Structures are given as structure tokens and as C-alpha cells.
């Protein structure tokens, strides 16, 4: 069965009525080949209904230049139009529907529902209805098609209330000059009003004026054989329906945006006819929204496909490197997608258009977000690598330059934020603040680790410096031990450590160390510094004996003017006086070092802790030992060490004294001839042997040897030596002068 005649199309035919669906493929072909698809949404649809064989098709052909089949009046009367035919005004954007006539003698009994379905289809499609009636039939209810309108109103009130206002034009045919126009208009409007009042309505529409849903006009046409008048009247009616410049144009306020584009009309009409033919409730806005959804979804996918290559290119680049102007490229892709979408989708339902546009944006944004995450990783990696390189360079810098350098490194965080801001298409869209916060934390952690490592290295260097300074302080006092030994060490230590403390505190603050950590660092600095001082003093205490001995020699061997003493010119009493005076001074200095302790205490001064030495005198010794922080390691010279030092010092001092005495007597002994000593040994050797055999001589010798061995065994090596020195010193002072004095007298006599 032929449906497509090129200039007209059989939209609803017997097959469509039987199958309850349209042949959408043929309709698509007709829309394409007839040029109707080119008019887009800027069109109006006009339908004509009326009794059969009343010249409806003829009237349409006269009005719009269409070529609907018309009845040959010389043949038998019958139905020409079956279902609904569709065509287009040859000059204007008006689509015309020729609807099957009512009161068909060919229609079988019980097919009124089919008539209603075709009328409802026309109503669903049309913006304006031309109801074709004859003047002599105004009193016939059926002839005026009012019964169909009643059924449509009664069953499909939602159709009117949801869509645009429908225009109804009653075309009264075969009008003559004797007819009363006002009476005809009143009667036709009265019929419609009666129908409106009779049909059931929702509560909120019970008081609604009929004219809020329908715009009704009555137009009269003379008998068609009065060609001149008939043509003039049909031209006027055509102008009302198609000429937007005509003052009586009935579609002046029409919203063309609500129209379905003719390219989508096949699907739209198929959906409508399926609903109508199955006697379902028809909801035109929903059908339009459905079509808009389908087309806008398709256009959205086409727009995404149109920017697919750009998306893939951006994705590939961001995987391998940092992309400059990332956000600008994303925006360019999005703008292009919107342009492609808007070009084909802007004529569809505005809400659907916006919804799909938002979906398009969301899909692109979601894709861009995956790229953004990779871009952010690249950005973080770039600045973290830059930070690492700069920190490697800073390792060679002085730590005192680090505070200023850290301020310079902070610029990297600002640069990261600026670059990240250039990578987002909308502030706050991709939670960039979280990325900034995480990067700052990662950046600060690496910076903190670097600072801690540098501080650890610096602390070792500082400890070495403190130890060296302490060694200088203590050594300067050890080289000249005085009664102010401890006071001077304390004073010099404080002067040195205070300067270092202040610099260290300023450095820690500049390196952004937290206040609690600063206190910990300073406490550790105080304790370690003081520990270094204690170690230096402990090591220096090993030189106390030698230094005191040197100071003894300086006082004993040299006169007050600094010149060496001439022992031969001094008497033994004078030598002994010099000896005891120098010895007592040295022992007094040694005694001042004997039980001194170094103790670490803190004093809260302007919220700063300081280390200081506490010199505890002999009277405080017991009190200190029972204190809670007493430590035996704090003692500089304990009792055993003190005894050893004093004995060794006394031994060395006595040797000096004996040496002085020997030098004093050196003249006298040198005057005795050497042969005399050989003769004395020769004549006395047998007496020596005899003495050795005498128990009174042997036993004392054995006792002395046992005493010496015992002292050596218990570690008192110097005790026998001191005893022998004392014995020989006594003999030297008492016996020898007597012997040599007698010899001198004999020589003198």
C-alpha cells in the first residue's frame, strides 16, 4: 500500500488502525524527502474535521496549495479521506492534517472509537482546528462534530491543561447574505460551552473559563462557485493561519520552543499513536519530553564523540608530564562539546535541554577529574623533586643561612597553589583545597626531616665546639692553678655558653621548630654542654699533679725576681724554709680541688633555662651526697685520687728538695780524694761481710725488705721510698755533719 506520495503522506491508514502503530520508517523517509524536516521547530499544524463529503480536502487544497484527493462530484457520493493525511503549505511553515470525515456510511457499526482515535490524534498534533460545517447544518449536533469534541474534552482534559491553548475555527460554508453571523457565532460557542459544562472536571478546573483553554473564531465562506468572493475569503483565512505579518495572525503569542522538531516527529507521532490506539491516557508534554530526552541524549553522545580525540590527547599527555594551562585545555574541550551539543539540541524541550547539558558537563568534568588527579600527581612530584634538589644544595650552606632559605622555599608552595588553581575549571569543584593541604603537609614533613637532620649534624659540630671551648677555659686555669680556679671556670663557661645558647635559640626559632621542641633542644644543649665541661675537667684533673709540681718548682727553684736560686750560697735552714713555703702553697691549692663537685642546676629566668656550676665546699659535702640528684661522678677529686696525687706530688717535691741540698753540699764532697773512697772500701769489706753474718744486723734488713714487699703488694709503692727518704734525710741532717765536722777539725789541727 502506497503511503508516501511525495507531497502528501497517509499518516493514519487502515494498517495503522489495525496494527496500532505507525510505519515509522516510511514516515522518516517522507519527512526527509518532502523537506518538512528543514523547518525545524518554527511551524504550526492545522487540522480539519467535519462530516464526510463536505469538501474538507477541497478547502485545504484551496487554502494551502496542497494536493489532497478530492471527490468527483459527478461520481457517486462516498468517503474519499480515510484516517489522516499529512501535507505542507507550499509557501509557508504550516503543516496540514486532513482528517477522515465523520458520519461515514462506509463505517461499520461499533467503529465510533476509531473515529474518536483519529480525532484525538489530530487534536494531539494540531495547534488549530478547522471545523468544516455548512450553514444549513448548524442545528445538527453530529454534523457539527460537537460529539467528537465532547468525547475528546471528557476523556483527555489533561491534554488541554498541559499543552498550549487550542485554536478552533468554525468555517461555515455556503454562507449567504441573509444569514445572521452573530446568531451563528452565538450558537456555535454555546454548543462548546454546554459541552464544557457537562463534562466532569477536576476540582481546580470546575470554575475555569472555557476560553482559557480554547480560542474560538467563526469564519464564513460563500458558496465555492462564487469564485471571486470565495478566493478572497480563503486568502484572508490563509493569511490568518500562515502570515506572521498579518494583523489577524492567530499564532502571534505562540511559543515555538514547545514544538517538536520535525526530524524527531516520526518517533514522537509513533509514541502518541501507540498511546491513543491502546486507549491509554495521553500526556503530550511527557511525549515531547520523551522525544527530547531521546534526541538530546543522542546529541550529547555525539558531542562527546566530537571531542573524543582531544580528550584522549590530553589524557595521554597528562600521564607522562605536567600539562601547562591544563584548565584552559579542559575548558576548550568543554566549550567545543557545548557548541556541538547546543547546535542540535537547543530547539528541544528547555528543561530536557538543560538537564542533558548538565549531564554532558558532568561527564566531561568526571573525565577531566581523572586527568586532574594525574595532573596533580605530576605537579606534586615536580615541586617535591625541586624541593629535594634545593635541599641537597642547602646541605652545603651554613645552617645559620637556613631560615632565610626556608622562606625562599615557601615560594614553592605558593607556586604549587597557583599552578593547581590553573588546573581547575571551577574553584572548589575538585576539592583542590584537600590537595593543597596534603601537599603542604608532605612538603613541610620533608622540610622538617631535613631541618632535623641538619640540626643533628649541627649539634655534633656544636658539641665539638663547646668541648673545644671548655678545654680552652679549663686549660687556661690548669696552666696556672689559683685559689679562684673554680670561680674563673664558672665565669668563663657562662660567658661562652650564654652566647651559644642565644644563637642556638634564635636559630631554632628561625628553623620553625615548635616551641615544645625548642625547649627540648635547649635542655639537651644545656645538659650536653655541661657534660662536656665535666669531661674536660675530668681529663684536666690528670694534669693537676704535674701543674702543681711546676708551680712548686717555679716558687722553690726561682727567687721572687725570677732568677734561679744559688743553693750553695744559702744555708740549709734557708733552703728548708723555701721548701716548706712553696710546698704548703701547692698543697693548699691541691686541697682546694680535693672534694669539689660539678652539679647541674636550672634557674627559671624569663622562661629560659640556664646551666651553671655549683661549687660545693667541704662543709656541704654530706648535704650534697644525701641530695636526690647526688652522683659520685660529679666529684672532681675523690679521696683515693687525692691521696695518690698528694703522695706523688710530695715525692716529686722532696726530690727537688734533696736535689737542692745535694747542690748545697756539692763543694764539700768534691774536696775528698777519690783514692780515699777506694781505701775505705778495701779495709772495710771484711767488716761488711761480718756484719751480714750478725743476726742483729741481718734481721732488721729482712724486716725492711718484707715491709717494702708488702707495700708494693698493696699498691703503696711510694710509701717505702718516703720512709727511706725520711731516714736518710734524718741521718743526713744529724750524723753526717758530725762525721764530716770531726774530719774537718782533724784536718785543721
UniProtKB/Swiss-Prot annotation:
Domain of life, source organism: Eukaryota
PROSITE patterns listed in its UniProt record: G_GB1_RHD3
HAMAP family in the cross-refs: Sey1
Side Cytoplasmic, residues: 1-671, 717-749
Coiled-coil regions, chain positions: 445-465
Origin organism lineage: Eukaryota, Sar, Alveolata, Ciliophora, Intramacronucleata
EC number: 3.6.5.-
Entry annotated with the keyword Hydrolase: yes
Family: Belongs to the TRAFAC class dynamin-like GTPase superfamily. GB1/RHD3 GTPase family. RHD3 subfamily.
Binding site for GTP: 50-57
Gene Ontology MF: a single term: GTP binding
Pfam families: RHD3_GTPase (PF05879), Sey1_3HB (PF20428)
Enzyme class: hydrolase
Organism: Paramecium tetraurelia
Keyword GTP-binding: yes
Domain GB1/RHD3-type G: 40-265
GO biological process: endoplasmic reticulum membrane fusion
Lumenal domain ranges by topology: 693-695
Function: Probable GTP-binding protein that may be involved in cell development.
Protein name per Swiss-Prot or TrEMBL: Protein SEY1 homolog 2
Localization per Swiss-Prot or TrEMBL: Endoplasmic reticulum membrane
Membrane topology: Multi-pass membrane protein
Amino acid at each position: 500500500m502506497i503511503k508516501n506520495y511525495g507531497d502528501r503522506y497517509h499518516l493514519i491508514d487502515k494498517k495503522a488502525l489495525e496494527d496500532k502503530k505507525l510505519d515509522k520508517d516510511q514516515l522518516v523517509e517522507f519527512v526527509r524527502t518532502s523537506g518538512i524536516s528543514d523547518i525545524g521547530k518554527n511551524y504550526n499544524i492545522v487540522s480539519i474535521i467535519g462530516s464526510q463529503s463536505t469538501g474538507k480536502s477541497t478547502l485545504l487544497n484551496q487554502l494551502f496549495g496542497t494536493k489532497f484527493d478530492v471527490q468527483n462530484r459527478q461520481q457517486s457520493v462516498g468517503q474519499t479521506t480515510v484516517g489522516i493525511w499529512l501535507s505542507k503549505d507550499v509557501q509557508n511553515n504550516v503543516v496540514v492534517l486532513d482528517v477522515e470525515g465523520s458520519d461515514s456510511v462506509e463505517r461499520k457499526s461499533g467503529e465510533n472509537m476509531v473515529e474518536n482515535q483519529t480525532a484525538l490524534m489530530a487534536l494531539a498534533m494540531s495547534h488549530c482546528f478547522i471545523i468544516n460545517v455548512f450553514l444549513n447544518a448548524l442545528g445538527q449536533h453530529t454534523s457539527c462534530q460537537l460529539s467528537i469534541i465532547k468525547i475528546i474534552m471528557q476523556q483527555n482534559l489533561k491534554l488541554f491543561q498541559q499543552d498550549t491553548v487550542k485554536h478552533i475555527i468554525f468555517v461555515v460554508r455556503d454562507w449567504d447574505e441573509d444569514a445572521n453571523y452573530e446568531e451563528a457565532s452565538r450558537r456555535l460557542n454555546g454548543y462548546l460551552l454546554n459541552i464544557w459544562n457537562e463534562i466532569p472536571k477536576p476540582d481546580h478546573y470546575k470554575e475555569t473559563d472555557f476560553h482559557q483553554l480554547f480560542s474560538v473564531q467563526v469564519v464564513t465562506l460563500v458558496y465555492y462557485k462564487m469564485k471571486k468572493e470565495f478566493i478572497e475569503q480563503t486568502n484572508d483565512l490563509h493569511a490568518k493561519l500562515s502570515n506572521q505579518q498579518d494583523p489577524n495572525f492567530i499564532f502571534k503569542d505562540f511559543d515555538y520552543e514547545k514544538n517538536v522538531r520535525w526530524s524527531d516527529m516520526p518517533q514522537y507521532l509513533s509514541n502518541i499513536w501507540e498511546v491513543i490506539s491502546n486507549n491509554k491516557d495521553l500526556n503530550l508534554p511527557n511525549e515531547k519530553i520523551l522525544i527530547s530526552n531521546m534526541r538530546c541524549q543522542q546529541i550529547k553522545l555525539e558531542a562527546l564523540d566530537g571531542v573524543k580525540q582531544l580528550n584522549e590527547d590530553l589524557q595521554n599527555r597528562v600521564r607522562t608530564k605536567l600539562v601547562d594551562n591544563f584548565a584552559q585545555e579542559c575548558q576548550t574541550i568543554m566549550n567545543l562539546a557545548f557548541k556541538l551539543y547546543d547546535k542540535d539540541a537547543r530547539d528541544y524541550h528547555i528543561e530536557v535541554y538543560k538537564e542533558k547539558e548538565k549531564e554532558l558537563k558532568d561527564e566531561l568534568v568526571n573525565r577531566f577529574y581523572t586527568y586532574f588527579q594525574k595532573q596533580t600527581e605530576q605537579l606534586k612530584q615536580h615541586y617535591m623533586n625541586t624541593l629535594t634538589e634545593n635541599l641537597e644544595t642547602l646541605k652545603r650552606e651554613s645552617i645559620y643561612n637556613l631560615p632565610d632559605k626556608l622562606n625562599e622555599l615557601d615560594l614553592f608552595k605558593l607556586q604549587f597553589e597557583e599552578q593547581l588553581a590553573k588546573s581547575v575549571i571551577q574553584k572548589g569543584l575538585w576539592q583542590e583545597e584537600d590537595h593543597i593541604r596534603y601537599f603542604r603537609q608532605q612538603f613541610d614533613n620533608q622540610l622538617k626531616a631535613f631541618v632535623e637532620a641538619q640540626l643533628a649534624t649541627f649539634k655534633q659540630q656544636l658539641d665539638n665546639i663547646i668541648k673545644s671551648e671548655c678545654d680552652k677555659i679549663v686549660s687556661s686555669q690548669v696552666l696556672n692553678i689559683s685559689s679562684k680556679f673554680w670561680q674563673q671556670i664558672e665565669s668563663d663557661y657562662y660567658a661562652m655558653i650564654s652566647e651559644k645558647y642565644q644563637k642556638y635559640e634564635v636559630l631554632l626559632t628561625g628553623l620553625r621548630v615548635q616551641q615544645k621542641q625548642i625547649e627540648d633542644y635547649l635542655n639537651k644543649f644545656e645538659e650536653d654542654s655541661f657534660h662536656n665541661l665535666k669531661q674536660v675537667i675530668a681529663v684536666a684533673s690528670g694534669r693537676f699533679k704535674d701543674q702543681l709540681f711546676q708551680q712548686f718548682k717555679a716558687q722553690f727553684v726561682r727567687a721572687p725576681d725570677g732568677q734561679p736560686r744559688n743553693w750553695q750560697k744559702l744555708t740549709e735552714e734557708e733552703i728548708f724554709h723555701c721548701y716548706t713555703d712553696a710546698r704548703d702553697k701547692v698543697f693548699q691549692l691541691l686541697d682546694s680541688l680535693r672534694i669539689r663537685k660539678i652539679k647541674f642546676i636550672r634557674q627559671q629566668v624569663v622562661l629560659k633555662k640556664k646551666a651553671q656550676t655549683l661549687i660545693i665546699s667541704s662543709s656541704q659535702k654530706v648535704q650534697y651526697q644525701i641530695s636526690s640528684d647526688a652522683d659520685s661522678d660529679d666529684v672532681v677529686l675523690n679521696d683515693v685520687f687525692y691521696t695518690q696525687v698528694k703522695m706523688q706530688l710530695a715525692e716529686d717535691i722532696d726530690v727537688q728538695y734533696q736535689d737542692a741540698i745535694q747542690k748545697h753540699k756539692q763543694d764539700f764532697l768534691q774536696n775528698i780524694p777519690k783514692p780515699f773512697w777506694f781505701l775505705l772500701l778495701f779495709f772495710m769489706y771484711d767488716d761488711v761481710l761480718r756484719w751480714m753474718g750478725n743476726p742483729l744486723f741481718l734481721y732488721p734488713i729482712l724486716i725492711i725488705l718484707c715491709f717494702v714487699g708488702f707495700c708494693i703488694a698493696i699498691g703503696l709503692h711510694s710509701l717505702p721510698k718516703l720512709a727511706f727518704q725520711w731516714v736518710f734525710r734524718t741521718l743526713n741532717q744529724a750524723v753526717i755533719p758530725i762525721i764530716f765536722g770531726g774530719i774537718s777539725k782533724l784536718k785543721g789541727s
